[in-house]
Design a protein with these regions (language model features):
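Tandem CBS (Cystathionine beta-synthase) repeat/Bateman regulatory domains
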Residues: 1-144
Length: 144
């Protein structure tokens, strides 16, 4: 559930933060998760990427559709690969206190659609472009 669904008072939409905009119920995988399971989750739930976390929720990577397709192009057998084999390790992320404008700039500059939200090194949520739009519209209902 989006945290912005709980906005019920006046708020300048531009001051909304990742902590307010993010979805905190996040599907994840571990570095040991097999790639076919990841692909099943991505296609079943219509995700373009899946955060890779350790047992303590430390964000260690991201598996995207691009990563999976790159493995296919390279002729790798997806049945024999784990997330650690194909994941992007240098993950662009945001912190809970980053505001809507800062996050929107990252989306526009880096051509991404979803970003992990971290507290230190721990994954606490995901924020998508659509979450920014939803939060903006919701906040505008109360702001003049």
């Amino acid at each position: 559930m989006r945290k912005t669904e709980f906005i019920d008072k006046a708020c300048d939409p531009a001051t909304l933060t990742a902590g307010q905009l993010m979805q905190d119920a996040v599907f994840t995988c571990t570095p040991r998760t097999d790639v076919l399971s990841i692909v099943r989750m991505m296609t079943t739930w219509n995700f373009g990427s899946l955060p890779v976390v350790e047992e303590d929720r430390t964000l260690v990577g991201l598996v995207s559709e691009y990563d999976v397709l790159q493995a296919v192009i390279e002729g790798r057998d997806l049945r024999k690969l784990s997330a650690a084999d194909i994941m992007t390790r240098q993950v662009l992320s945001v912190t809970e206190d980053m505001n809507l404008v800062q996050i929107a700039n990252l989306f526009q500059d880096r051509y991404v659609t979803r970003l992990p939200v971290v507290r230190g090194t721990k994954l606490v949520g995901l924020v998508a472009r659509r979450d920014l739009l939803f939060g903006y519209v919701k906040a505008c209902q109360y702001w003049s």
